[in-house]
């Protein structure tokens, strides 16, 4: 996923989960309480397995746990999200997890993010912009929260709207970015969980081609309503 930085510290990503189908790790996600994971809608697949407390794909942690989805919730039909809107999915685990050395939830944000913030993102995604090279352990990188227009202007072919519930983040000179396999993972700005990795350019980490993240703060009411049992809750327009 992550280009341009190093392996995450084993103790800094207790909330990071890995989504597998068969034996393939295809997305990340974020544990937000003992029973719920937040990820991207485009990470919806059949037969998802969720690994929690994982660092190395080859050498399991003693407290690593596996779950499967009990329920999945979307703002819209899972096929109706767009590049700029509603790429968000809530997964209820089939049984709760307990906090442990390598498992603990990340709380939802208490305030919206500010442009200019330094944000950290992470995942097991590709670590080469041109080769199918995937790491054994998650990589972490610091990037900047940018004006939304910085994601709109470089991609005229997507016809992105003038405003959106999407965050734009990256390094304008390139070299640091999320990449294939990082989707669904967290964007953490000033210590708060603000974004869900949604989409970016391919090849990754090109100059003036930052990536887009679903804005968690704008979806708080929907998230909290679903968790509280109000499954008819609607997302922000």
Swiss-Prot record:
Residues forming the Peptidase S1 domain are 2-228
Q: Which residues form the propeptide?
A: 1
Question: Which SMART domains does this UniProt record tie to the protein?
Answer: Tryp_SPc
Cysteines joined through disulfide linkages: 27-43, 119-189, 151-168, 179-204
Q: Which sites carry carbohydrate?
A: 80
Q: Does the keyword Chloroplast apply?
A: no
Q: Decide whether keyword Hydrolase is in the record.
A: yes
Protein name, please?
Answer: Thrombin-like enzyme agkihpin-2
């Amino acid at each position: 996923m992550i280009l341009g930085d190093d392996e995450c510290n084993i103790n800094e990503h207790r909330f990071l989960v890995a989504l597998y189908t068969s034996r393939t790790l295809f997305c990340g996600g974020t544990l937000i309480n003992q029973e719920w994971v937040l990820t991207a809608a485009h990470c919806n697949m059949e037969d998802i397995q969720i690994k929690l407390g994982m660092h190395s794909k080859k050498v399991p942690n003693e407290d690593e746990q596996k779950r499967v989805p009990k329920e999945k919730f979307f703002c819209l039909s899972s096929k109706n999200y767009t590049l700029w809107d509603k790429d968000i999915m809530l997964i209820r685990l089939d049984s709760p997890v307990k906090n442990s050395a390598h498992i603990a939830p990340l709380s939802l944000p208490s305030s919206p993010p500010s442009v200019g913030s330094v944000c950290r993102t992470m995942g097991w995604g590709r670590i080469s912009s041109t080769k199918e090279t995937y790491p054994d352990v998650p990589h972490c990188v610091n990037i900047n929260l940018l004006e939304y227009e910085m994601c709109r202007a470089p991609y005229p072919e997507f016809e992105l709207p003038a405003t959106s519930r999407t965050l734009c983040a990256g390094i304008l000179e390139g070299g640091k970015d999320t990449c294939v396999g990082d989707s669904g993972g967290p964007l953490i700005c000033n210590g708060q969980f603000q974004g869900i990795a949604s989409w970016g350019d391919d090849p990754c980490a090109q100059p003036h081609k930052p990536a887009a993240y679903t804005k968690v703060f704008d979806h708080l009411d929907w998230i909290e309503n679903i968790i509280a049992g109000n499954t008819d809750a609607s997302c922000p327009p």
